[in-house]
Amino acid sequence: KLLLDSGRVNFGAALDEEPKPQRVVINFIVLGVPVAKKRPRFFLRGKHVGTYNAQETEEGRLRLDIARQLPVPWTLLKGPIRVICRFYMRRPKSHYGTGKNSNTLKQKAPLYHTSTPDIDNLQKTVYDCCNQVVWGDDACVFESVSRKEYSGSPRTEITVEVFNHG
């Protein structure tokens, strides 16, 4: 089923190739320090065990920021979705010079954020906040790309790509 092009295999030219999917791209920018998903906490009150999520207000703020950027009326996305998340973390003071150079970034200051919070917990927060706001369920996400970087302005940038055949 693959066509040969001067002795080489051309993988992009299958005889009964499906039409290329159409793609819709939606971008969100949420200002503020990215929030990682935290584990629920348990407590004992008498003989009853209870749980609480210490993070509900932070998730609510993120969900509201995302919802405000959607057009009205909005229909929840369906189908295969690719999500690209870029988490920009605040730089610590140790990345900057001292004295008159206190606003100058050191030459050896790293670009990528390699400490906590973990990137998977940052993703979980974004996915949970997009459930029933942007898409119906995060099970429709077929590909996810994420990165953590340092920045002077902490924020979360989310790109959602929806693929539809036809």
Enumerate the predicted regions with their spans:
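Acidic, proline/glycine-enriched N-terminal capping motif
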Residues: 1-166
